[in-house]
Amino acid sequence: MAIVKCKPTSPGRRHVVKVVNPELHKGKPYAPLLEKNSKSGGRNNNGRITTRHIGGGHKQAYRIVDFKRNKDGIPATVERLEYDPNRSANIALVLYADGERRYILAPKGLKAGDKVQSGVDAAIKTGNTLPMRNIPVGSTVHNVEMKPGKGGQLARSAGTYVQIVARDGAYVTIRLRSGEMRKIPSDCRATIGEVGNSEHMLRVLGKAGASRWRGIRPTVRGTAMNPVDHPHGGGEGRNFGKHPVTPWGVQTKGKKTRKNKRTEHFIVHRRTKK
């Protein structure tokens, strides 16, 4: 994997920084694991915009990724690594001994020809999935379940990981990249290693059009609008002299939005400020 800085042959290429991985498959994805992925344009079923700055972009097919990794006791061989337009991480196509193929998240260091396995008896090796009660304390894992059997929900983006810091009976304590420490049932599964493609954060799109290819529309500042369009709008010069709010007058930039007291007691330590 290499970081390539493009030559300034045009204004749109001048600032582009790409991540090039020669190990990625250059052909088409595995068709039986594809689904149609329709774009919403940020609209709900009434046709109203519920999420701004979404629209357009290149047509994409959804890759069905196995986050549960529940095919226990059957070894699988990594056939190839692939690009996935729906996530920052790369994915791996694995062939199980019984002939079934599945997509999994590609951990760091995984390559074509490697063997992976799931279940209680799986070895502590990159790409293998086990219940967290069977994973040694101090191990780095990803694709972590929060409810047994639900499938991985934590640490699925490129370069992310979770560390197991303690085990106490029915729960294990994990440390997230944010600094938060929380308890999770020890029957929940996790995959050994960290998610690959950690260089994803170093890429530079270089031009507005690259965002449009990804379905991201421009974001207009409230202070650049008229008073009829935004609470920050209008005035002489660039000032709005009030606390930052959304276009609908709700406080933003730092206002707490978490309302999930049901799981508060699982959080041992809050995330730390960066």
Swiss-Prot record:
<dbReference type="Pfam" id="PF03947">
    <property type="entry name" value="Ribosomal_L2_C"/>
</dbReference>
<dbReference type="GO" id="GO:0003735">
    <property type="term" value="F:structural constituent of ribosome"/>
</dbReference>
<feature type="compositionally biased region" description="Low complexity">
    <location>
        <begin position="39"/>
        <end position="48"/>
    </location>
</feature>
<dbReference type="InterPro" id="IPR022669">
    <property type="entry name" value="Ribosomal_uL2_C"/>
</dbReference>
<feature type="compositionally biased region" description="Basic residues">
    <location>
        <begin position="253"/>
        <end position="274"/>
    </location>
</feature>
<comment type="function">
    <text>One of the primary rRNA binding proteins. Required for association of the 30S and 50S subunits to form the 70S ribosome, for tRNA binding and peptide bond formation. It has been suggested to have peptidyltransferase activity; this is somewhat controversial. Makes several contacts with the 16S rRNA in the 70S ribosome.</text>
</comment>
<comment type="subunit">
    <text>Part of the 50S ribosomal subunit. Forms a bridge to the 30S subunit in the 70S ribosome.</text>
</comment>
<dbReference type="Pfam" id="PF00181">
    <property type="entry name" value="Ribosomal_L2"/>
</dbReference>
<dbReference type="InterPro" id="IPR014722">
    <property type="entry name" value="Rib_uL2_dom2"/>
</dbReference>
<dbReference type="InterPro" id="IPR022666">
    <property type="entry name" value="Ribosomal_uL2_RNA-bd_dom"/>
</dbReference>
<dbReference type="InterPro" id="IPR022671">
    <property type="entry name" value="Ribosomal_uL2_CS"/>
</dbReference>
<keyword id="KW-0694">RNA-binding</keyword>
<dbReference type="InterPro" id="IPR008991">
    <property type="entry name" value="Translation_prot_SH3-like_sf"/>
</dbReference>
<dbReference type="InterPro" id="IPR012340">
    <property type="entry name" value="NA-bd_OB-fold"/>
</dbReference>
<feature type="region of interest" description="Disordered">
    <location>
        <begin position="221"/>
        <end position="274"/>
    </location>
</feature>
<dbReference type="GO" id="GO:0016740">
    <property type="term" value="F:transferase activity"/>
</dbReference>
<dbReference type="GO" id="GO:0002181">
    <property type="term" value="P:cytoplasmic translation"/>
</dbReference>
<keyword id="KW-0689">Ribosomal protein</keyword>
<feature type="region of interest" description="Disordered">
    <location>
        <begin position="28"/>
        <end position="53"/>
    </location>
</feature>
<dbReference type="InterPro" id="IPR005880">
    <property type="entry name" value="Ribosomal_uL2_bac/org-type"/>
</dbReference>
<protein>
    <recommendedName>
        <fullName>Large ribosomal subunit protein uL2</fullName>
    </recommendedName>
</protein>
<dbReference type="InterPro" id="IPR002171">
    <property type="entry name" value="Ribosomal_uL2"/>
</dbReference>
<comment type="similarity">
    <text>Belongs to the universal ribosomal protein uL2 family.</text>
</comment>
<dbReference type="GO" id="GO:0015934">
    <property type="term" value="C:large ribosomal subunit"/>
</dbReference>
<keyword id="KW-0687">Ribonucleoprotein</keyword>
<dbReference type="GO" id="GO:0019843">
    <property type="term" value="F:rRNA binding"/>
</dbReference>
<dbReference type="InterPro" id="IPR014726">
    <property type="entry name" value="Ribosomal_uL2_dom3"/>
</dbReference>
<keyword id="KW-0699">rRNA-binding</keyword>
